[in-house]
């Protein structure tokens, strides 16, 4: 593999399918998609392309046997609720939700239309499903990360920046994941000589003030736990970490791609393709109540070598060896 600024080279955008006329013998099916990110977000475009690629591999072609109506929430809760209502009003065969926030908006709108979600850390705690094995309602999908992954983030921070003795944890306390991941981090912290301080993620101004205040303490680091707010504000968070020379670990590979030091989390594109598989099964007659919620099967470690160099960090060979090569 050619190692450039990133240890992990992720696949590029997939070519969009050719639109053809529906054949008389085929029934046109309709899929609604509620994206959490904005339409001009490069990561969002790559993800929706992976989703459509997954559908194509299962025999679904836009304009021939399926129509896809995509709405872009742009990380805005009000906008997501509006588009959730609009999508539900069109009564598609199934709706694809791409984050906890969009899933919540859809669940508030409909309890009958089938929903397949990705990007939800604790669907049981959030009330979207009765259990992982038997969802029991109109929603199922693919969980994002387990709470224990929080401890892995802290381990990675300490490994890539051994001098860190104090870590601030960006989290959303309104989400079950915000509490669960923090608990896993705090349980590990004493054994590796790190003190922790949680910061609630709500808006950029609050994050900026908290990080600036925290950065005054020597040997500090940053752990960004899963939340839609962190994704929406990823570029300001990355910029703040760089301005204050804070080594930081993130839960999503797009953070490292955008300049963050290191990320560890599920292969998101793989989950989007898997979601296409569940939607295919629903379109063929299965119900979300009987399709178990699946945990991630593949995780990715991404290291931004340029950022590591700027922070004066030497990436350990053990981490380089764990980085995927494509």
What are these regions (language model features)?
Residues 1-326:
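Short hydrophobic alpha-helices and adjacent helix-cap/hinge residues
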């Amino acid at each position: 593999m050619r190692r450039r600024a990133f240890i992990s080279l992720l696949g590029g955008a997939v070519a969009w399918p050719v639109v053809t006329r529906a054949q008389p013998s085929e029934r046109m099916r309709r899929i609604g998609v509620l994206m959490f990110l904005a339409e001009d977000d490069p990561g969002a475009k790559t993800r929706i392309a992976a989703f459509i690629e997954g559908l194509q591999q299962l025999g679904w072609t836009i304009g021939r046997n399926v129509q896809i109506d995509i709405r872009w929430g742009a990380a805005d809760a009000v906008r997501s609720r509006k588009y959730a209502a609009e999508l539900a009003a069109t009564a598609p065969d199934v709706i694809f939700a791409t984050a906890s926030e969009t899933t919540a908006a859809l669940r508030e709108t409909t309890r009958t239309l089938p929903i397949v979600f990705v990007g939800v850390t604790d669907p049981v705690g959030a009330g979207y499903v009765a259990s992982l094995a038997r969802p029991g309602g109109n929603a199922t999908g693919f969980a994002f990360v387990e709470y224990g992954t929080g401890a892995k983030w802290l381990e990675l921070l300490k490994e890539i920046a051994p001098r860190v003795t104090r870590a601030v944890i960006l989290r959303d306390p309104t989400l079950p994941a915000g509490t669960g991941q923090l608990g896993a981090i705090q349980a590990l912290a004493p054994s590796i000589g790190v003190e922790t301080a949680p910061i609630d993620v709500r808006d950029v101004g609050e994050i900026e003030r908290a990080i600036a205040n925290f950065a005054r303490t020597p040997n500090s680091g940053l752990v960004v736990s899963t939340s839609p707010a962190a994704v929406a504000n990823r570029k300001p968070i990355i910029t703040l970490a760089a301005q204050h020379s804070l080594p930081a670990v993130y839960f999503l590979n797009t953070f490292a791609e955008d300049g963050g030091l290191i990320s560890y989390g599920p292969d998101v594109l793989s989950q989007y393709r898997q979601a296409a598989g569940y939607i295919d099964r629903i379109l063929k007659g299965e119900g979300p109540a009987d399709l178990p919620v699946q945990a991630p099967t593949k995780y990715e470690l991404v290291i931004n070598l340029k950022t590591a160099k700027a922070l004066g960090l030497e990436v350990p060979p053990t981490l380089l060896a764990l980085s995927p090569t494509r």
